Amino acid sequence: MASRQQTRIQAYLEKNKIGPLFEELMTKLITETPDQPIPFLIDHLQSKQGNQGQLQRALSGSAALWAESESSEPKGTRRDFRSYDKPWQMNAKKPKKSKSDLAVSNISPPSPDSKSLPRSVDHLKWNWRTKPQSRDFDELNHILQESKKLGKALENLSRSIAISDELDKETLAFNSSLLRPRVIGEWIGRAENDADPLAAEMLQPPVPRSKNDSWESEDSSSSPAGSLKMEPKTKGLKQQQQQHKKLLAAMLSQDSFESIHSPTPSVIEEDIDNEDDAMELLENLDDLRMEGVTTLVLSGSKFNQGRPTHPAEPQAKVTLNICSRLQGDNLMERTEDTLQILHTPDEIIPDSLDSLPGTEETLMEEGEDFEKTSNLTEPGEASSGAHSLKSYMEEDESLKQLQVVHQPWLLPSDTESEGIEAEQDKRSADLLCVPCSSCPTLIYSGLSVKPAKEVASGP
């Protein structure tokens, strides 16, 4: 019985479209939200009564509602409930709610005292100048700023704590005896009203204390065994200029010739090193001794700025005599030139005897000049000339054989490389010499009159 009545009700509802009608009424109430819902529904039903012919369409669900709502409303207020946006329309409508949402709204109807918003609110245009209602980005920015402030506050707090700790440590260290300022030596012989005390201290070094002092014996193991010799920065410009002039005068006073041949370095270099601190590269033994260091290592004492004292190795060189017109007729000037020539260790003969015109005559003239100058030389130099003559006589036979073949030949030297270098020096010297009528040819050091005559008389 109940099932028959239920089927009859279901058929009635489906026949008269009661379900879609109520769905349409609910959607109109939800979308329009009028102040007086009952008169609004009555007006809507009266408008539906005049168009009953369209309700007979074979449409189902929400499609019938859309068709009925479009036909019932005037064209000015036509509304579309499709769920996608239409950017080409200025007033995009809200998407249509599903049936589940409508069922929920049927269960909990709106309260009668709820007021509906004016319809102009629904048709407001979007304005890009107005701020959005959502504050998400502003809140995020605010959170970031607050975190930065907190980070800065924490950093300042930690810095202040660290500074306070350092101040505490400094006060403890100042009160302690370990980091107490100390004076290593006593200054002797300096006036109290000295204008430049630092310069006086540099000139008069301190006298080292004895090792039985209590505070020095405690820290002698931990103190560094080196000292830096610092030039006072308060020196004026005039003092620096005077010191520079002294340094230049000391450098010019050194004899360069003697510094090359002498085995011992000059004494002035130590004064230069003491005056100029830029030359001081390694430890100063006086400073170490003044600090109380007993075991001094001489290997790292001080860098010597002097020239190297290597033994003078013989080098094959060719010297050119100056023209007699430029040199003058004074015989003493010529003897000085020949004495300087005699200092050169090795000698070289030109490449070929035939390459120079009048070689025999020029060699005879050189022999005569050597006879004149050898009378003015000292006995030590004469003995050195005799020694070179003896060494030359031993090699005379081989030289004569080379002269016959007219090959370029060299006088004996220590190594072949020295002969090659001497030959190159000779050729460059020949290019520099300007021959004239009164200019003597090459003078070879170490030769006297007899070997010159023998070379001239050779084949």
UniProtKB/Swiss-Prot annotation:
Residues 72-85 have a biased composition (Basic and acidic residues). Gene3D superfamilies: cAMP-dependent protein kinase regulatory subunit, dimerization-anchoring domain. InterPro entries: DUF5586. Signal peptide: none annotated. Residues 66-119, 204-246, 364-385 are annotated as: Disordered. PANTHER family: RIKEN CDNA A830018L16 GENE, SIMILAR TO HYPOTHETICAL PROTEIN. This is Uncharacterized protein C8orf34 homolog.
